[in-house]
Every structure is written in structure tokens, then in C-alpha cells.
Amino acid sequence: MWAPTVTHGGFSASQVEEIKRAVSIPVITVGRYTEPQFAELMVKEGRCDLVAFGRQSLADPYMPLKAQEERLEDMIPCIACLQGCVANMYAGNPVCCLVNPFLGHEAEGIAPAEKAKKVMVIGGGVAGLCAAFIAQEKGHQVTLYEASDKLGGNMRLAAYPPGKGDITNMIRSYIVRCQKAGVTIKMNQEVTLDLIREEKPDSVIVASGSRTLILPIEGIDNPAIIHGSDLLDGKRAAGKK
């Protein structure tokens, strides 16, 4: 069973406990574990002998080391999206990870830039945050501009439906990485040509996100029509339908 985002971590804990009581051999459990504290508790309480981290090891292969060093805020959590790992595995393609673009390229690392540049990143969604972090790690001076008062972009909206809250962990981890790397983040700042001319960046990364796909249906522009993004963002109410 490949547990999706809506399934909580450790969902099979009670079943594993029953198996542990019934057998005399070591029991290893797996079940969307992303928190080392929970895994440690399972072993300490004798509910299992070992906890296996599957997809979490793809999202962050250094998670055990970070837990040992008590750097929990640095961990990159698996959001159980099943997009880069399971979907590619069944398609016979190389496995990748939505929260860890370095998967499979760990040995390459982030090569330092030959020349440090002043970099402007437009957009504080996940793509913008990731680009800003990597550029800063390469040695550039990076400033990220977000037009609204919230980071995360469309991924933030994707986390609002019931059962999707863990998606916010992806946003949080990128924010933490940017902050620790030294990225300057400016909120409520729309980027204009005048601002670009004023700041004089060497490079500009446009990560302003996508626009909602609206089908060409007659009447779709009626004010009574509520679009999903407006509903999720709290800009419109859907009533009790």
C-alpha cells in the first residue's frame, strides 16, 4: 500500500503492535513515517524492533543524522505526493522527488559559482524559494520578492483541502533553507521594470507562478461562478452546497 498525503504517518502502528505480540522474531514496520520522534517512540515502547523509512529517505537521506544532531528544523519531510517516486517507478522512469530535487545527484552537490552575482528572484512560491536557496548556496547575493503577504504560492492553496495539510511542510522546509542560507526575502513587494532598473541585478529569475486554467465555457465569467483558487484562499464563500 502506498499511503497518500491524506493518510496520517504511522497509520499501521496498531496492527504492527499486534504482530509484535504474536511473533518471536524481529518486526520492522513501515507506514509513512516522517517524524523520527514517532519512530523512536515506537521502538522504545516495544511496539516494533525497527522502523523503515522508505519515501522519507528519498525526500531526505540525511534525516537520521539530522535527528541525531537534533536539527529537526532542517529535515525535509516527505509529503506523500506519490508523484516523483511511485509514478516514475511504475512507468519505468528514474525516480525523482518533488521536495528533493537533488535526489540521485547528491555526489554532485551545489557547485560554487565562478563569479558571485546579484540575483533577483520574482515569486515566493516553492519554485522561487528553491531557486533562491540554490543560488544563495552557490555564492550569489539573492533577494526574493513576493507580491503577497504569504509564501508558498499555489502549493499553499493545495494544502488547504482536508487531508492535505502536510503539503505545508514542503513550504516550511524551503523557507527554513532560504533563511539559513541568507536569502533576503521581501514581502508585499510587486516587481516592476522600474524596480529592476533601480536594483540593477545581474540576473533575474522569474518564478511568478501559473495562472488558473479557465475553460472557454459560455457564462464562465459570471460573478456567481466561484473559482477553486478563490475559494481555497478565502476570497469567496461557497455557502452550504
State where each predicted segment sits.
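Glycine-rich dinucleotide-binding loop and its adjacent helix/turn
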Residues: 100-112, 176-179, 185-187, 194, ...
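Short hydrophobic core segments
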Residues: 145, 201-208
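Alpha-helix C-terminal capping/helix-to-coil transition sites in glycosyltransferase folds
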Residues: 47, 198-200
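Beta1-alpha1 glycine-rich phosphate/pyrophosphate-binding loop at the start
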Residues: 121-188, 213
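Short acidic loop-to-helix transition motifs that present clustered carboxylates
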Residues: 34-37, 58, 190-193, 231-234
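Short, contiguous acidic/charged loop-to-helix segments that flank catalytic cores in large enzymes
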Residues: 2-8, 110-116, 157-169, 227-235
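Flavin-dependent oxidoreductase catalytic cores
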Residues: 1-122, 126-142, 150, 222, ...
